[in-house]
């Protein structure tokens, strides 16, 4: 989730279709994601949908037995022309629905710090967030997230590397 110059308001949206090969998965997942920057920060969302309802078997070790999961976040930055320009306030919602088990809604609030090279081809955003998960006890209600993007790796136009890593704590019991 990066703050880029707001000279233009553009949205980047893409859809991806994956086949999960793991012995405990073997199904198709569709991911739709969108990133949009504006003069007050940026908005990001994604929706994952697993197409495996026809393979439902409650006795199987299948880790995601059909369902939809989404995250939507907003980074707010009203001080882009100040020494605090790399810092933003962050709010986020996570949730989903499946046939056999609940995905508890979660709200996250906190700050993020954005770094980039001069060309904006290489970016890194670090987030420290308070995370509250519905119907869940949490000893440490925090989430730390890193989001990165690298364009034209090794000088090869179009070769990109992007991703994220989330770290959080949650006490829970899953019953199927």
Residue ranges and their predicted role:
Residues 8-12, 37-44, 77-88, 116-124, ...:
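Short loop/turn motifs that connect adjacent beta-strands in outer-membrane beta-barrel proteins
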Residues 11, 26-30, 64-70, 103-109, ...:
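Residues that define the transmembrane beta-barrel architecture of outer-membrane proteins
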Residues 17-19, 45-49, 89-95, 124-130, ...:
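Transmembrane beta-barrel strands of outer-membrane/channel proteins
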Residues 59-111:
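Hydrophobic/aromatic-rich structural module bridging two neighboring secondary-structure elements via a short loop
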């Amino acid at each position: 989730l990066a703050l880029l110059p707001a000279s233009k308001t553009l949205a980047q949206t893409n859809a991806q279709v994956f086949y999960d090969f793991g012995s405990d998965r073997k199904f198709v997942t569709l991911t739709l994601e969108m990133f949009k920057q504006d003069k007050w920060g940026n908005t990001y969302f994604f929706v994952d949908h697993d197409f495996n309802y026809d393979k439902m078997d409650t006795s199987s070790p299948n880790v995601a037995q059909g369902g939809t999961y989404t995250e939507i976040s907003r980074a707010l930055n009203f001080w882009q022309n100040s020494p605090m320009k790399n810092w933003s306030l962050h709010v986020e919602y996570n949730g989903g629905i499946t046939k056999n088990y609940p995905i508890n809604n979660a709200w996250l609030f906190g700050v993020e710090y954005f770094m980039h090279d001069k060309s904006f081809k290489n970016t890194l955003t670090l987030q420290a967030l308070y995370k509250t998960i519905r119907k869940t006890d949490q000893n440490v209600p925090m989430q730390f997230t890193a989001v990165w993007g690298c364009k034209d790796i090794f000088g090869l136009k179009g070769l990109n590397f992007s991703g994220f890593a989330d770290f959080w704590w949650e006490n829970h019991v899953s019953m199927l």
